[in-house]
């Protein structure tokens, strides 16, 4: 194998696979793609069956299984922080919800100095480029992209429809497309699943078309040790293969692109000598470039579940029983249909809890079964739940390498629930969710409130429940943010400030977290920056219309109003 390439990409995840595929469309360009995990085994139902999404989080084959430091505002809990490991990265283990964020998120990015070409209308063409939606393209959706997007179909679970109707009856808008003209409101939720009912990871969508190209070299089980520099220029990478302690060196003629995700990208930069001077010196790491923002500005989405018993036998509870699972698996394996072919997040919504929020600050995922996201603590009866989470918390955390050892996980602290806004949003969110769940559309299905339980009413009782039960939505981001201020790490093209030949391209470069799931936006970022790297003209700006709430009320009058503490 040649040890010199034009580009070295560290991380074959949502961004890295997109970059590798686009860069190698130019036959004269050579790319080395390094991935610490293994292949995305297509026979492994745990990653390929949409309904099995909880399984990869339960082990370490596909999951880095990071843990936070004790979170000071969450009763000192060490909280789960799963990230994908293997070809596809977190697109190999995520919940497959295809949500792009709100148009106002990107317009907000573009208001920051140096990010003027990140408006929603600049980004929308790249969302479309990446996507093939099963019902065809329009102004908002693509029809020829690598990411297969499935829309909910007639005849799916009646609880999805009842939950959307309940949201509308509670006074919120109805939207036909959470990724279209109007995100705000309740409606069907798209998912990154192929027409044959398989997970549409970036390994399947992007690498499958690129991996046979002679100018792309993929090395799995390759854990990057550090980036190599000649002065301020990145010239290569050293990495470990498997359990070996021997460093392998590869050289980059043009650039090293770090696409290791919001946890591992800042850690790799720090181990390589790019980061806050005081941290590097405390670890005896020679300082290549003092860049204080590396690992700072860390953001995430926190969420919790409101669970209800279901009085009709229409939930997915029977699918949790082992004796029903062989038939579900067989239908999925041979036909690509049935319960196994969906992630079962086919309805959701976005709302504003208070007028001061100019676009939605709460997201809902509806699930027709009562169970934890990671597959634990399944309620042993028919039930359903709403996942409710805040979208743009003011809380900021950080990532810090603990040593030079690439196998040692970093110190992670999100500072969840560290601001008064966090507590207000979650209290409001729980109370508004209860009002939604009390609407007539759910009368035929709604039993008792299982969690938190109807007895949990006061601010103090709600706060206790939040501290004990809120958990990550697995959306870490913003730890190597784009921008020009003193804490920015990269510019609007992903180039690391003060360095040459070094970029970061992944969810870590978001300056502010978006309103929704991160995967589609991470892919969009890589699509957009790949054109920059290739020296191509950007795709023409979209002219699509999009909704701005303006002075519109947060909600209308609920059909059934609910008195709460």
Curated annotation (Swiss-Prot):
Organism whose genome encodes this protein: Pseudomonas entomophila (strain L48)
Binding site residues for FAD: 6-35
Metabolic or biological pathway, per its Swiss-Prot or TrEMBL entry: Amine and polyamine biosynthesis; betaine biosynthesis via choline pathway; betaine aldehyde from choline (cytochrome c reductase route): step 1/1
Gene3D superfamilies for the chain: FAD/NAD(P)-binding domain, Glucose Oxidase, domain 3
HAMAP family: Choline_dehydrogen (MF_00750)
EC number(s) reported in the record: 1.1.99.1, 1.2.1.8
Protein name: Oxygen-dependent choline dehydrogenase
GO MF annotations, alphabetized: betaine-aldehyde dehydrogenase (NAD+) activity; choline dehydrogenase activity; flavin adenine dinucleotide binding
GO terms (BP aspect): glycine betaine biosynthetic process from choline
Annotated Gene Ontology cellular component terms: membrane
Catalytic activity: choline + A = betaine aldehyde + AH2; betaine aldehyde + NAD(+) + H2O = glycine betaine + NADH + 2 H(+)
PANTHER family according to UniProt: CHOLINE DEHYDROGENASE, MITOCHONDRIAL (PTHR11552:SF147), GLUCOSE-METHANOL-CHOLINE GMC OXIDOREDUCTASE (PTHR11552)
Domain of life: Bacteria
Region (Disordered): 182-203
Described function: Involved in the biosynthesis of the osmoprotectant glycine betaine. Catalyzes the oxidation of choline to betaine aldehyde and betaine aldehyde to glycine betaine at the same rate.
Pfam families with a match to the protein in the record: GMC_oxred_C (PF05199), GMC_oxred_N (PF00732)
Family: Belongs to the GMC oxidoreductase family.
The protein's required cofactors: FAD
